[in-house]
Design a protein with these regions (language model features):
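A charged, well-structured terminal subsegment
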Residues: 1-10
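Residues embedded in well-ordered beta-strands within globular domains across many folds
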Residues: 6, 146, 220, 295-296
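Radical SAM [4Fe-4S] cluster-binding motif and immediate context
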Residues: 13-260, 282
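Flexible glycine/acidic-rich beta-alpha junction loops that bind and position SAM and/or redox cofactors
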Residues: 72, 105-112, 155-158, 229-234, ...
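Residue-level recognition of beta-strand->loop/alpha-helix junctions
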Residues: 81, 222, 265-267, 299
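C-terminal, active-site-flanking charged/polar segments
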Residues: 243-247, 282-288, 300-305, 318
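Catalytic cores of alpha/beta
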Residues: 271-285
Length: 326
């Protein structure tokens, strides 16, 4: 479930700018002195952005979060379970679910960490996101906005409207000069967020064109693996929401529209075979040659609170977690 969260951002912003938490301990009648700071010459070897005229650092990238958590339940991740587990009792946390009698694997939804979500995903509206963009543009004049939500929008009809409305606001802002036309936007998105599900599964080309017009440049896609079987194993747990065919449709579609998508790959998935390992390496290499960026991590690292971590901790899987410093 996704719910829009209406927060009076204008009031909050003005509060932080005019007073802020740092000012709460100050008496109202104390006159604040302006502190002059001498700035020396910039280090020519420093790679931080420096304004050559004022010797002051300037902001190139703004990082924003617009939602409470990710609705997906990937087996290695705890984003979806944080609110659930923070409200769970010790008895609920330690409960051992009953194994299926037919010899099948325990369904992930039977776990405390992956059960029904007591909290919907809250996100701020396109208008509120746009307002935050404008305020940061006015104050910092950045070059890039990075939306750091695990899933910036969801691939449902309301989710598509959410991102399309934001794109329209950004496009209009660039046309009127309210936003610098060269500003870029980056975000993380799931493969399924680019796919129209009904009546037939197809690439949402209209959305991709709208994203490009608005200035979206880079998408980090949580592919994890190109091996079809591994998409539904417990440590990955895509639960049949996406297929390898979907992955190829979206990645190739983004390439065809002039994007260079970033594909996140976990190289050593615990349940995989040698054949699947080589297959994933082969497909990833082919996409690299086409211009796709491959963000590859060698090991699957389960977060505490994730489904696979709970299975391991409760002895419900033959998999073991071995932690090392590297």
């Amino acid at each position: 479930e996704i719910k829009d969260l209406h927060i009076p951002y204008k009031d909050y912003w003005e509060y932080t700018q005019n007073e802020g938490a740092a000012a709460l301990n100050l008496e109202k009648n104390i006159k604040k002195e302006k502190i002059e700071v001498e700035l020396g010459e910039a280090d020519p070897h420093c790679d931080l952005p420096v304004n050559k005229d004022t010797q002051k650092f300037f902001v190139e990238t703004i990082r924003l979060y617009t939602s409470s958590h990710c609705p997906w339940k990937c087996g290695f991740c705890s984003s979806h379970s944080f609110l659930r587990m923070s409200n769970a009792t010790a008895e609920q946390e330690e409960k051992i679910p009953e194994m299926p009698k037919n010899g099948e694997k325990l369904p992930m939804n039977a776990l405390t960490s992956c059960g029904s979500q007591p909290h919907p995903v809250y996100r701020i509206s396109p208008e509120q996101i746009y307002d935050i963009i404008l305020r940061h543009c006015d104050k910092y004049d950045p070059k890039v906005f990075l939306f750091n939500d695990d899933a910036f929008w969801d691939g449902s009809t309301p989710g598509f409207k959410h991102i399309m409305d934001l794109c329209n606001l950004i496009i209009e802002g660039k046309k009127t000069g309210r936003i610098n036309k060269d500003i870029l936007f980056n975000c993380q998105a799931k493969v399924g967020d680019f796919i129209i599900k009904k009546p037939t599964r197809q690439l949402h080309s209209e959305l991709i064109k709208k994203l490009k017009e608005a200035g979206f440049y880079h998408f980090g896609t949580g592919v994890e693996t190109f091996a079809e079987r591994l998409l539904t194993v417990q440590s990955i747990n895509k639960k049949g929401n996406v297929s390898e065919k979907d992955q190829h449709m979206v990645i190739q579609g983004l390439l065809d529209h002039g994007f260079s998508p970033s594909v996140n790959i976990i190289l050593f998935v615990p349940e995989q075979t040698i054949e699947e390992l080589f297959y994933v390496m082969k497909v990833a290499t082919e996409y690299m040659l086409k211009g796709t960026q491959i963000a590859m991590t060698p090991l699957l690292r389960p977060q505490e609170g994730s489904g696979i971590y709970e299975l391991i901790r409760k002895g419900l899987t033959p998999l073991k977690a071995h932690y090392v410093e590297w």
